[in-house]
Amino acid sequence: MGREIITLQAGQCGNQVGSQFWQQLCLEHGICPDGTLEDFATEGLDRKDVFFYQSDDTRYIPRAILLDLEPRVVNNILSDTYGSLYNPENIFVATDGGGAGNNWAHGYAHAEKIFEDIVDMIDREAEGSDSLEGFSLLHSIAGGTGSGLGSYLLERLNDRFPKKIVQTYSVFPNNRSVSDVVVQPYNSLLTLKRLTLNADAVVVLDNAALAHIAADRLHIQNPTFHQQNQLVSTVMSASTTTLRYPGYMNNDLVSIIASLIPTPRCHFLSTSYTPFTSQQVEDARTIRKTTVLDVMRRLLQPKNRMVSVNPGKQSCFISILNIIQGEADPNDVHKSLLRIRERKLATFIPWGPASIQVALSKKSPYIKTNHRVSGLMLANHTSIASLFKRTLDQYDRLRKRNAFLDQYRKESIFENSLDEFDNSREVVADLIREYEACEQPEYLSM
């Protein structure tokens, strides 16, 4: 019974994160870098078919499509240890190789030109699935390819596969510091419109929080992108464990989304993970004690969140799903939930159930860890709106000066007017208002 997920990796960030993700999945499922099964790995304990298919020579191949408008990152992946893992027919690098120049409009326009090639790959993967559940897009929203090509993909996937789930792992820029991409607020706003209108669930990760976690939890002061990507791939693999080691609940994407997203517009999720160790991130320090209560309490601590938000007085959780991996006794889980409720460690919306949902999941038998229990929290929290507000404020400052708009006017979508900017701004402003409305007791009757 397959519920397959096709992964689309767009741009530099998407492909670098994706590359780490596939390495992590191979380790967890006992798959060698060339796709063959390790001698010690056994069939039947896990569901590899959600993310991999088997070729005629029984090698495991990721259901992944690698897309970029410049060749450097994809070439690095293909010349690396895991380079022969991927299906070469599922790799698209633009022939002119010039990239999108950190410009959303260029990435979007380029995607239109090459879409026939990309859609062939997507259709072939979809037809090779027994019962495709949906798509997962990995990208960043600040540059040109991940944002522009990513946006175009989201729109077309909705048109072409209206009944399939579209979920993303979207890396937001560190918008509290000066960026080397001056047009980042434009790119972010235009992408946010598509993430709001064309995705069913968006897992938000931001570079500011990732750098902070690396410094604070792992004692790595200036983390490399490679180390930050290891954090992201750990979260991605943990968020898919219930699909790959299925239990009674949360064993497909639709059930995870249904438990986290009660109203369709508020579908931006944040994550926390504990404990990070040197097994996931090179040179990280370890935490000694991991009881179920300890893990569940740490997951609720703001400093472990992978999104840098500014919670207001009324900020609250809409929903929480904790995925606990390892040796977890259901009685311990029950006691931990009672303790968290007694101590009021989590504030929920006034109009819905104030409960933390918990999924217990197996750990990979092939990876030895020095902690008994690890946990991932997927949370829908109203403070995520503060991240969108920052993007909006930065956009407004640039737009007021009409800065750098000529680069966008060169592309057909902005040739005759800048309406697309105004329209995107309105969609994001509505999204912020929706999250603020969620904090009110009368939300459902508004």
From Swiss-Prot:
CDD domains: gamma_tubulin. Keywords: Cytoplasm, Cytoskeleton, GTP-binding, Microtubule, Nucleotide-binding. SMART domains: Tubulin, Tubulin_C. GTP binds at residues 142-148. One of its GO terms (cellular component) is microtubule. GO terms for molecular function: GTP binding. It comes from the Eukaryota. Its main location: cytoplasm. The keyword Membrane does not apply. It is found in: Cytoplasm, Cytoskeleton, Microtubule organizing center, Spindle pole body. Belongs to the tubulin family. This is Tubulin gamma chain.
